[in-house]
Amino acid sequence: MKLKHLSLGILLLVLALALAACAGPAGPQGPAGPAGPEGPPGPEGPAGPAGPPGEAGAAAEMAELTCVECHNDTTLISGKRAAWSVSGHGSGEAFLRGTSATCAGCHSGGAFSARIAEGLNPDELEAGDPSPSRQDCRTCHQIHTTYTAEDFALETTDPVAFFAVEGATYDGGLGNLCVNCHQPRRVFPEAVDGMITDITEHWGTHHGPQSSMLLGIGGAGAEGQPGIHYSAVEDTCVGCHMGEGRTHTFAPNVATCQACHTDAENFDINGVQTEIQAELDRLGEALVAAGVLSENTLEGHPTVTEAPEGVATALYNWLYIHHEDRSLGVHNPPFTRALLEAAFAALEQ
């Protein structure tokens, strides 16, 4: 029996080998089966080494460039500030009046900028500046708004409609900025029964009526025309008081006058200042004699609270020319003469 089983096993092995020997070559690989589901992510590998530093970004580059555009080793800022520090605007104690609502819009640098931004007249502020400051770069220029050279642009150069003189507008180029303050605060009042009342120690046009003098308006008893310096001088105030070099002392330079008055050696061109000073002295003496003026100097102030219209007319024009405009006729010689003539005529009434 065992022999029979062994023989059968050998036979099966022989048959298997025979079949294997008769098999053909392997066929081509079948198509790939569908992808199986995605396996879970493996663990995070270690961080690679730090790469080289990149170039400076745009923000850092812009910040550096715009600062050094002004804050550099030139005298661009220091020179202007040195000149400004000795100017009337950059020195003195006038800024202390900025705590008053009626004064802050011109006497405080910060309040001036704020009211210009809001489009207000000097008399439209509701409150004074609790911390008034002298006028500085930011008062007239748009400092630190773009951090580029555009920051030196003026706060405004729009024509200025006077807030006290009805219907009057000043359009003098860059000088328009100045006229936002350098304009009359009052006009000559109407007489009541031949008398002018409410005269105070600080009566008159108030400080800075140079713009109205240039336009030939704002006086008492006289009508004028715009002076030649309003129409012929480019940028009016800026043209004369800063010149081509834009000097920030604001002291006028005779060299500017010499563009037209080639032989000028001072501001007394054709003797106009000598003439006007003599007439002012004569008028001041008459007003002191009339008992309405304390003294015939820059320290002189009205000593009465009311006066006849003629006397008040003379006093108003003396204050306008002597105390407030202070150009001794340079701003508008014909109108200055007309104001003095009206003053003397009024005293004789």
Region annotations inferred by a language model:
Residues L19-A21:
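C-terminal motif of bacterial Sec signal peptides marking the signal peptidase cleavage site
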Residues G24-A63, E265:
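Collagen/collagen-like triple-helix recognition
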Residues A60, D73-R97, A104-E279, R326-V330:
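Inter-heme linker and motif-flanking segments adjacent to c-type heme-binding CXXCH motifs
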Residues M62-C70:
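Short, contiguous pre-domain boundary segments
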Residues E265-Q273, Q277-Q349:
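Mature extracytoplasmic or organellar-lumen-exposed domains after removal of signal/transit peptides
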